[in-house]
Amino acid sequence: MKLFYRKIGSGQPLLILHGLFGQSDNWNSLAKLFAEKGFEVFTIDLRNHGLSPHDDEWDYETMSKDVLELITDCNLQQVDLIGHSMGGKVAMRLAIDYPELINKLIVVDISPKYYPIHHQSVLEALNAVDFSILKTRKEAETVLSNYITDFGTKQFLLKNIYWK
């Protein structure tokens, strides 16, 4: 799958993988800082997030292969890799399967263990949104409000909505 990414700077390649419900621009301010420090920074929208394609297949092995495809397509070698939360799981899987491609690995806010489901209310809220009839983010927010009371969480989820 061809993932959407943003690139800034030049130097040692640094790939940044966001967490669940995140997207590439979550890391814009740090990407600029890393670019100033001599990195070619790739902030990536993982599958089913941001501007990357959506697909029913969605597991860490598949997601790591998506990142591998990006590395290959961009002719990158020995990348530094930062993964946050879900992106950390993807980064760890990539590092295990393709250690020769990874120079440095930084995993933020996750560990290599199984976690029980804990986003059930968020998933129920997202499943309740019928995008075939909604036309605006405000309409989606109204549906989400039936499940999620926290303003910040709702806004974070709404940021990931794109009509094509």
What are these language model-derived features?
Residues 28-36, 40-42, 46-82, 86:
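Active-site loop/oxyanion-hole signature of alpha/beta-hydrolase fold enzymes
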Residues 132-164:
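Conserved alpha/beta-hydrolase catalytic His-Asp/Glu region
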Residues 1-14, 36-39, 76-77:
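Alpha/beta-hydrolase fold catalytic core
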Residues 16-19, 43:
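Structural cue for short, hydrophobic secondary-structure segments
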Residues 11, 19-22, 85:
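Active-site glycine-rich loops that stabilize anionic/oxyanionic intermediates
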Residues 92-97, 101-137:
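Flexible "cap/lid" loop of the alpha/beta hydrolase fold
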Residues 22-23, 47-52, 113:
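Active-site loop signature of alpha/beta-hydrolase-fold enzymes
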